Amino acid sequence: MQMKILFLIIIFNIAAIGRLAAEDGSRLWLRFQPQEKESLPSFTQIRGEASSIALQEFQHAWQQMSGSYLPGNGGKNEHTLLIGSLKNREVRRLVKSKELQELGEEGYIIRTMGQGNRRTTVVASTGEAGLLYGAYHLLRLIQTGKYSDTLNISEQPRYDIRILNHWDNLDGTVERGYAGHSIWQWDKLPGDISPRYREYARANASIGINATVLNNVNATPEILTAEYLEKVKLIANELRPFHIRVYLSINFSSPAALEGLENSDPLNPEVQQWWKKKADEIYNIIPDFGGFLVKANSEGLPGPQDYGRTHAEGANMLADALKPHGGIVMWRAFVYNPTGEDRARQAYNEFMPLDGQFRDNVIIQVKNGPIDFQPREPFSPLFGAMRQTALMPELQITQEYLGFSNHLVFLATQWKEFLESDTHCMGEGSAVAKCTDGTLLPHPLTAIAGVANIGLDANWCGHHFAQANWYAFGRLAWDHTVTAEEIAEEWIRMTFSREPAFLEPVREMMLLSWETAVNYMMPLGLHHIFAWGHHYGPEPWCDIPGARPDWLPPYYHNASEEGIGFDRTVTGSNAVSQYCTPVSERFNHIESCPEELLLWFHHVPWDHPMQNRRTLWEEMCYRYDGGVQQVREFQKLWDRMEPYVDSERFRHVQSRLRIQSRDAVWWKDACLLYFQTFSGMPIPYDIERPVHELEELKQIKLDLKHHN
């Protein structure tokens, strides 16, 4: 009997050989898988301050990869890893002080010196934050198999503040969140401090993110009460060792709501005094508090315009309250009203007249495009135009308009297109990135924000591949010159596998995924044709009686028997005039307008000849169908990857790709059948036929109010 049991155990173990252990994705890109000794650096000892978070983090990772900690000063000195600042005499001997000081407290040097049996790899910085970022960079090289014994790396961040915006509510829900409830778990604080806070901090620090806004921009005044400030303090305590500062979104009417003041007028001395006292209170509790994020006079929220004041007057009042403590105000430019004016023009029209009127500790936070995180938008014309005021880009990591956490969409390609867009506002080469990182327009503050896609789901982001967008935001915030290809490869190597048979096809899938989603959702510059409210799926026919026109798809697509698209030329809304020359000219003329943005700027006849000689209608059909077919190719590709992925993550991604494939057909059928009622043209016969009836699709109403 015992022999039989032993035999069964042996058979089971043989069957298990080659099968990868299941993973839930909770370790993100910080898996630090065990490696063969030959594939690890030849470090024989580590030196530095034992209390340094950088040294501790490196040792924590090294132990997982090698099975043991590196010895300290007592170890062999054949290959020493030295992690230290200019306070360390050995660092001063190996690295020039001026060289380090020019990189600032967040910059670092990684350099290997010596040869043979006497080598030293030094990670050096003038600040503890720089040491931490340098240690993570070294770990990234080891994880990705890119480490060498000839390292000579010098880096510093492109943006000073690299910040996540959490749209998390105090009741635990997350607006536009698709990965579970809020990780902050306000109801359990102060008694229960989740270990996830430290894991969150570690993940962010590993990619250079140094700030976070804890609560929704649609803020409630309660966040500024003593009860919640104590909870914020506890979160800040967990994030601080990883050099992450905490910020809060505030409600502009807080003085009236919390103190019972007659109003919240920014020119009211009582209101000004209330904010100064509140700032004093916050900094007494959280000495390194970062400042406020403000959404004002937008989508029904209160703001200075309620009292006849300007955005500058509102922002400056808050800035004055924060100034003595070193705090800043991030004032959002996402403003629009249900007027007759083109929504795409409104932020520019409200903020351009205020250029130069903001305090130096105010920075205007501007969404990448002029509408609202659409699958593809042109860059906002504010970038490069406001030269006397600091501007920061706001990107959306969470996929509000790109399939939630059901669709695989790698956003680094979208963000690279945006950051590299040439505004021409200071001549050729005036890319958005250079207009905002201090290169062309020096300001005391530079920053970039990303709306987080993080929740309580085990894998943090709902979809395993959505983790790549969190990672990509951090990498681009640190260095916007890194390519999307490099980011994808790093993430795949750390999160899944280094195997070329896995790495290369999956990287290609990621790089194609954004354009694929644009094609099956809103190609050729179409925008805002999604379902009412929750924004999941197509609803180009949506018409809600009494609703604001600028919340309805027909406002944007303007489909008729004559054609489709929004005329923003000089003979239309004239939104093109907000761009600098020659960009404005290029967008204005249908012959020179990029086809990817054609229907954003032009109302185009259905039979308009495209560059490939197809008509507009035909090209639209082929774009939608191409998106569908590409997702199906993703499915086939992923199925071939099964030998390289653990079963849990493989099945999860496989299941999500099935949803994405069905959704792509839904989008294609809905949009082509609906727009065909205007064009009156046949769908090209070599394209897969619709499988739905239009009236059937119009009946779809999803209840997604509580998706998280």
Residue ranges of model-derived segments:
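Positively charged n-region of N-terminal signal peptides that target proteins for export
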Residues: 1-7
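Bacterial N-terminal signal peptides
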Residues: 7-16
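Acidic, contiguous N-terminal accessory segments
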Residues: 13, 20-116, 149-150
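Feature activates predominantly on carbohydrate-active enzymes
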Residues: 50-57, 61, 97-293, 323, ...
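Catalytic domains of carbohydrate-active enzymes that cleave complex glycans
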Residues: 430-708
